[in-house]
Amino acid sequence: MPEYKAPLRDMRFLIDHVFDFHSSYAALGASDASPDMVAAILEEGAKFCENVLAPLNRSGDEEGCHFDNGVVTTPKGFKQAFAQYVEGGWHGLAADPSYGGQGLPHSLGLVISEMVGSSNTSWGMYPGLTHGAMSAIHAHGSEEQKQTYLSKLTAGQWTGTMCLTEAHCGTDLGIIKTRAVPQADGSYAVSGSKIFISAGEHDMSENIIHLVLAKLPDAPAGTKGISLFIVPKFLPNADGEAGERNAVSCGSIEHKMGIKASATCVLNFDGAKGFLIGEANKGLNCMFTMMNHARLGTGMQGLCLGEASFQGAIKYANDRLQMRSLTGPKAPDKAADPIIVHPDVRRMLLTMKAFNEGNRALAYFTAQLLDVAHLAADETQRQDAENLLAFLTPICKAFMTETGLEVTNHGMQVFGGHGFIREWGMEQLVRDCRIAPIYEGTNGIQALDLLGRKVLGSQGKLLMGFTKIVHKFCAANAEHLQLKGHVAQLNGLNQQWGALTTKVGMAAMKNPDEVGAAALDYLMYSGYIILAYLWLRMALVAQARLDAGEEDADYCQAKLATCEFYFKRLLPRTASHQAAIEAGSDCLMKLPAELFAF
């Protein structure tokens, strides 16, 4: 298994120099997050993830979760690691101080979540789902519900889930069958079965708080008739502690390709006592708070597993000796040269590096917007951040997982045949990553959300909010001595982006299938442009530090070289995505369903 080391240098480069989190924190009134405190948190977070979580990654995959008559036991060491995580204060790092949290910015919490996910993705899903449940209750719960649940969730005594999917419906939640019948005491009797519930049952906390989508008896049809309910595993008693067992049980756990140490459960609700959160029939709006949190978290999984894969691949490429360089021996005192000298191996490694570092920049850029949306005093500033988040969230989820899967595949390929062998650990990263483009809304659904709802649905407003940022950036740096060629390339694509969007929108007015046909290519096209913008932001800082004679010259040179690789070898993929978009829907829809197979 690759030995994980938190990429603190790259993290600090983004935090300190590219995005200047510290100035942002000061402007948002989050002065408690001082540079010294942030540095200490990063160091301690790295130690915990490297020394506690990473050693459990392979063993957790080998052992998996155990199911026995409704009881789920997590792999050896998981429960103890969670206790250490909670004791160290990590669980409430960015949570509201009113409920026992430390109140630090969301962006700092996201940096720690990257370390957690890279060191042990399966383990990280348990606290990750809880943070999502906390966000939904905090945003939509009554004061009584907040007082009852948030302190326990923040403290890590209780954990949370979200329960959406049923056997007959995943994407189409409007046809769920789970029902909630009003009771005389104001509660609801929730009945039905949910599947694919991550962390639905386990032994890591005293109680599990399920957020469940269900329909009231008189609910309107479709998604406008969905309500959200808090359904605890153990009902809180008068003292606020876990009391009587509720009528919710785990029927089984799934046997999966990857993330085997994360318990994926079938949950049965047999008249379980539930409590309405938010307004009746407005549950999907409430759940979207948690779903958007989960979608950003899922996008992070692409980055996290890609980082772990790159660390294994770069070490192997420097150690593995095979053949001689085409330009002559590079290690003449050895039997062969290390494979890192070969162009095709470098192609894979640089692709991994460019996507990982670009995706990290995208994640931190998005996290900084989360800070603004939550903390800014100015309403206009908050709304602008919310609009950008709405636009970026489906891109973060889908682009980062598509490229993350590509990165883990490259990592396994660098190892050759050894990558296919379990003991090296590279194939586990591929298996763990494969679910990321599927759950929390498939990437096809994310693409429809982006193009249909966010871009065309806003009449282009959300897209223009971002393209204006890029346009301003390009105008300011058009004459940059070393980078003006890349700036011009980005500027051209940014202008083309709007024109291409208009073309798709016009075609969709005549044929709605045009949106579905173009959506995924449109999302990937958008992702490549966004990463180009972020790579140039990193390159500008790196070049400025080189010009100033800063001590990190080698690191900055590497940044500039990787930026050049991205612009020359990866950004041109936009051309193929554009061609596919412009090809339209006819070639997809003309073949009758009965002729797909004979």
Pin down the residues of each PLM region.
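A glycine-rich, basic-preceded beta-loop-alpha segment at the flavin cofactor/substrate interface
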Residues: 196-198, 235-251, 256, 263-294, ...
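Internal maturation/activation junctions in enzymes
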Residues: 65, 78, 126-130, 141-183, ...
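A short core secondary-structure module
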Residues: 187, 191-241, 245
